[in-house]
């Protein structure tokens, strides 16, 4: 059970606080409710671009890193389809430095032609390194575009194309910042060796006088039900052929999300899983085979991913996976498998939140889902999954008409 405090500023900023007496450090975790799904389809990559722009300095801190490092701190950030997250860790006695830096860049971010052009160049180079000049780099561009036809999950967080990043105008960038980077679109968690009263006081001091922004109401295109199987072959000179099968599933807030997640574990988590025992070891057709969920807040994907052994055809590989899925749907999950996966999830959850920093991130994510208190209910949601419920979800999910298949590699 994680005990934490909550506070809401009059301008809408949500503050979470977790006290840890076993450290002399404090972490600030700032989660902005904006991800790549909030981008214009003709101007993708802005959410990730801002992950870089936020470190270009501000009016009173031209070099963001210098005062933080002088205070013994460090920082980083990441972007996803659903959110953008920034965090600092520093000694408790210097915590106000982080509040000042975050407040200043929210109010006076250095959005100049020079800083924008510099960071565009950095992101374009990152795009080339991650997506164009490395084996399998564009795999998920094809996966997303195949599985999604209207929802903005159809492009990756880094952006759809280099040209989208290159052609983003100063006006587009400034408008994106004004619309999404605001106190009423921010969840702040202060965790570590700091009392709640001090966390509240510092938050009020550095963020209390911000005016709330007029945050756009999300009106995202909803993905229609897929009614027939989709297949795409992409020829690429990569070391191994890859087969990816994607089934539409519910989003992170849905009651069946944990069931889908457990289904992926029953199939592929560990050496006692179905895929490992019955397919990977026995068939020799694959060097890797796993199942996972995308974990997105809007309806996402249940993904079966395989690397094929040299000389194995895509048809034979798919036949083996289809046969194992059909056998699973016919025989069903055992009570032992469900209990094993629930135990594994609980241990993973505990290890994932051992530190005050990780608790801070998780608290923000659960708050964005709807209620930070749900962090203490998550294990129970896995514990109450029954065999019947798991199989009902599996039978609806693992429907061939609900599947998009990507054949990727030299033999595609």
Regions found by a protein language model. Name each.
Residues 57, 89-122, 290, 294-352:
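M16/insulysin-pitrilysin zinc metalloprotease superfamily fold
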Residues 187-190, 307, 328, 336-412:
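C-terminal regions of mature proteins
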Residues 27-89, 155-158, 269-285:
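M16/MPP (pitrilysin/insulinase) zinc-metallopeptidase core fold and M16-derived inactive scaffolds
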Residues 2-5, 149-150, 154-157, 182-251, ...:
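An aromatic/glycine/proline-enriched structural segment found at the starts
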């Amino acid at each position: 059970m994680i005990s934490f405090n909550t506070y809401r500023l009059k301008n809408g900023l949500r503050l979470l606080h977790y006290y840890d007496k076993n450290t002399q450090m404090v972490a600030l975790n700032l989660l902005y409710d904006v991800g790549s799904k909030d981008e214009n389809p003709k101007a993708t990559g802005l959410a990730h671009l801002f992950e870089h722009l936020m470190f270009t300095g501000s009016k009173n801190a031209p070099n963001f890193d210098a005062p933080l490092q002088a205070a013994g701190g460090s920082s980083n950030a990441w972007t996803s389809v659903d959110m953008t997250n920034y965090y600092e860790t520093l000694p408790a006695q210097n915590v106000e430095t982080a509040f000042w830096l975050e407040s200043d860049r929210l109010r006076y971010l250095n959005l100049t032609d020079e800083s924008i052009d510099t960071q565009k160049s950095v992101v374009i180079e990152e795009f080339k390194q991650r997506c164009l000049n490395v084996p399998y780099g564009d795999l998920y561009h094809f996966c997303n575009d195949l599985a999604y036809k209207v929802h903005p999950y159809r492009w990756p967080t880094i952006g759809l194309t280099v040209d989208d990043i290159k052609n983003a105008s100063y006006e587009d960038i400034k408008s994106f910042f004004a619309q999404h980077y605001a106190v009423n679109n921010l969840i702040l968690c202060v965790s570590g060796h700091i009392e709640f009263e001090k966390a509240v006081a510092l938050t009020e001091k550095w963020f209390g006088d911000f005016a709330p922004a007029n945050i756009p109401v999300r009106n995202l295109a909803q993905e229609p039900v897929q009614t027939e199987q989709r297949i795409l072959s992409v020829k690429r000179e990569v070391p191994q052929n890859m087969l990816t099968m994607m089934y539409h599933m519910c989003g992170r807030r849905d009651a069946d999300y944990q069931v889908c997640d457990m289904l992926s574990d029953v199939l592929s988590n560990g050496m006692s899983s179905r895929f490992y025992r019955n397919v990977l070891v026995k068939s020799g057709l694959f060097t890797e085979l796993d199942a996972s969920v995308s974990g997105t807040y809007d309806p996402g994907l249940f993904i079966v991913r395989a690397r094929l052994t040299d000389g194995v055809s895509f048809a034979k590989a798919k036949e083996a996976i289809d046969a194992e899925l059909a056998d699973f749907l016919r025989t069903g999950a055992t009570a032992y498998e469900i209990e094993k996966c629930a135990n594994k999830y609980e241990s993973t959850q505990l290890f994932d939140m051992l530190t005050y920093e990780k608790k801070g991130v998780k608290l923000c994510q659960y708050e964005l889902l709807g209620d930070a208190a749900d962090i203490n209910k998550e294990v129970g949601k896995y514990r109450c999954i029954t065999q019947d419920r798991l199989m009902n979800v599996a039978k609806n999910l693992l429907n061939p008409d609900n599947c998009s298949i990507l054949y990727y590699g030299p033999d595609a």
